């Protein structure tokens, strides 16, 4: 079971928030608190973040059950502790250095690749996906409109980070051990192993994203988030039939980036 922290009740005995309490629950106040804690490592719960990372592989449903607990105790779905983001950034740095080593990049080239991966691939793409999902879910997936039936933007970004972490570990860490001697061998076994790794990684991303939105009780038709599995399976079969090697394309793209 995921560890939790005790918090004070979110409202007075009459169930109505005072003006001061209401101000503390605004989106701006939550964002300010999150960013402020980003520079205070002693206030972050890294042990809990590590537990979440483990459960994202073994039992991701438990992670989203904790989001339910946070909503009940702190009146927000999104994380208020940036520890997960910090640990994810460390994982990105370590795995990107590993990619630089495997691809025989110089120190400067590896540093440029690191900037691209952190600020574009993770944060930049994450902001776009979170904003798109925030708009789509609030516009088309909410059962009924109301302030209590609103998908927080911060939560959509958390869902992206949750789904991105397993993808990162699979593509940027596990795959490293197979690139030079297996995946880039030029044989069928090479692109079979590489493309299968991509299938598993993207499949994880789709599934954990689905779990994130299906965990919100006020959303409908969340099963449509599983539909990309059909396109993913078709693309996988086509890639094997036509000899496409996704990892080879990724390596060429990374080398092109750091020129």
UniProtKB/Swiss-Prot annotation:
<dbReference type="GO" id="GO:0005637">
    <property type="term" value="C:nuclear inner membrane"/>
</dbReference>
<protein>
    <recommendedName>
        <fullName>Protein unc-50 homolog A</fullName>
    </recommendedName>
</protein>
<dbReference type="GO" id="GO:0000139">
    <property type="term" value="C:Golgi membrane"/>
</dbReference>
<feature type="transmembrane region" description="Helical">
    <location>
        <begin position="83"/>
        <end position="103"/>
    </location>
</feature>
<feature type="topological domain" description="Cytoplasmic">
    <location>
        <begin position="203"/>
        <end position="222"/>
    </location>
</feature>
<keyword id="KW-0472">Membrane</keyword>
<feature type="transmembrane region" description="Helical">
    <location>
        <begin position="113"/>
        <end position="133"/>
    </location>
</feature>
<feature type="transmembrane region" description="Helical">
    <location>
        <begin position="223"/>
        <end position="243"/>
    </location>
</feature>
<feature type="topological domain" description="Cytoplasmic">
    <location>
        <begin position="1"/>
        <end position="82"/>
    </location>
</feature>
<feature type="topological domain" description="Lumenal">
    <location>
        <begin position="180"/>
        <end position="181"/>
    </location>
</feature>
<comment type="function">
    <text>Involved in the cell surface expression of neuronal nicotinic receptors. Binds RNA.</text>
</comment>
<dbReference type="Pfam" id="PF05216">
    <property type="entry name" value="UNC-50"/>
</dbReference>
<comment type="similarity">
    <text>Belongs to the unc-50 family.</text>
</comment>
<feature type="topological domain" description="Lumenal">
    <location>
        <begin position="104"/>
        <end position="112"/>
    </location>
</feature>
<keyword id="KW-0539">Nucleus</keyword>
<keyword id="KW-0333">Golgi apparatus</keyword>
<keyword id="KW-0812">Transmembrane</keyword>
<dbReference type="InterPro" id="IPR007881">
    <property type="entry name" value="UNC-50"/>
</dbReference>
<feature type="topological domain" description="Lumenal">
    <location>
        <begin position="244"/>
        <end position="259"/>
    </location>
</feature>
<feature type="transmembrane region" description="Helical">
    <location>
        <begin position="159"/>
        <end position="179"/>
    </location>
</feature>
<dbReference type="GO" id="GO:0003723">
    <property type="term" value="F:RNA binding"/>
</dbReference>
<keyword id="KW-0694">RNA-binding</keyword>
<keyword id="KW-1133">Transmembrane helix</keyword>
<feature type="topological domain" description="Cytoplasmic">
    <location>
        <begin position="134"/>
        <end position="158"/>
    </location>
</feature>
<feature type="transmembrane region" description="Helical">
    <location>
        <begin position="182"/>
        <end position="202"/>
    </location>
</feature>
<dbReference type="GO" id="GO:0034394">
    <property type="term" value="P:protein localization to cell surface"/>
</dbReference>
């Amino acid at each position: 079971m995921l560890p939790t922290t005790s918090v004070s009740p979110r409202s007075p005995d009459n169930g109505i928030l005072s003006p001061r309490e209401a101000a503390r629950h605004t989106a701006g106040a939550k964002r300010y608190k999150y960013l402020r804690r980003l520079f205070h490592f002693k206030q972050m719960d890294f042990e809990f973040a590590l537990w979440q990372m483990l459960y994202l592989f073994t039992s991701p449903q438990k992670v989203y059950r904790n989001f339910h607990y946070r909503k009940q105790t702190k009146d927000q779905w999104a994380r208020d502790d940036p520890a997960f983001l910090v640990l994810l950034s460390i994982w990105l740095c370590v795995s990107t250095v590993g990619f630089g080593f495997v691809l025989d990049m110089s120190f400067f080239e590896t540093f440029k690749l690191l900037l691209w991966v952190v600020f574009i691939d993770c944060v930049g793409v994450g902001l776009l996906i979170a904003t798109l999902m925030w708009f789509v879910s609030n516009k088309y997936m909410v059962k009924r409109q109301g302030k209590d039936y609103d998908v927080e933007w911060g939560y959509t970004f958390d869902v992206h980070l949750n789904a991105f972490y397993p993808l990162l570990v699979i593509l940027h860490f596990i795959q490293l051990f197979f690139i030079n001697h297996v995946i880039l061998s030029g044989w069928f076994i090479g692109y079979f192993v590489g493309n299968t790794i991509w299938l598993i990684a993207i499949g994880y991303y789709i599934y954990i994203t689905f779990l994130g939105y299906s965990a919100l009780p006020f959303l409908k038709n969340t099963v449509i988030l599983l539909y990309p599995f059909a396109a993913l399976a078709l693309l996988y079969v086509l890639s094997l039939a036509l000899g496409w090697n996704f990892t080879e394309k990724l390596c060429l793209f990374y080398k092109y980036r750091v020129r």
